[in-house]
């Protein structure tokens, strides 16, 4: 009986030791793997400095699409990446009522392309906007750049880029270093989600506040709905002290409009402020279409950093 018991215990002992050893080895392997991954994350920080090409006030960012170099307007008002030109044979196609509600004849071709920002490549959806070859709009748009690059592609990418635009130095810094934003001083402004323009509260004149969007593709400094400006002008004596004048501006009309047109606007020279970021004698224009936004001219006043990871925009005014 004793011999049988000893034999049974002896036969089971190696399995117990083997199981315990396996657990220890598994624990050590997981620990080493976690340490290696954490260390790899710290070491795989991507930062690239891209020279800015500025044309007609717009910021052009060099982007490689399917091994072709493109100069795309960095447009926070755009939802994705859009190229101007002829239609390309993509697998997917959709028609939007937004630009052709009557005839449904115009389509925006969309497909997956190899897109490179600096030295990082990804396959991203790219849209092709068909433009008539003889249109003045096509000629004007192609004179500015090859297309639009919105803020959303930077948000949707796995690297979650920070983008810092510095027109004074003529550079755009693109990075996935999450510590970088913490080291960047300035005003932080939140936005909600990718398909909504980054917005913030502004102050016009002495007392009027409104929420507006940052549209880096717009050529104006700031536009506010005509009805709002009329209300301020009638009800506020201090706002009347702002220098009002009529002006004619040249609009790059909507992407699918037929021509570029000039329109008369009512403009004001007022104090413009985003919290601590102030611009004296800024030109505030009315917009009959009801679009309220701050355009690309604000880039000439401050270094602006886009932080999609923390959903912030950082304004860093130039030292006077």
Feature roles, as predicted:
Residues 40-320:
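Pepsin/retropepsin-fold aspartyl endopeptidases
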Residues 1-44:
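Bacterial Sec-dependent N-terminal signal peptides
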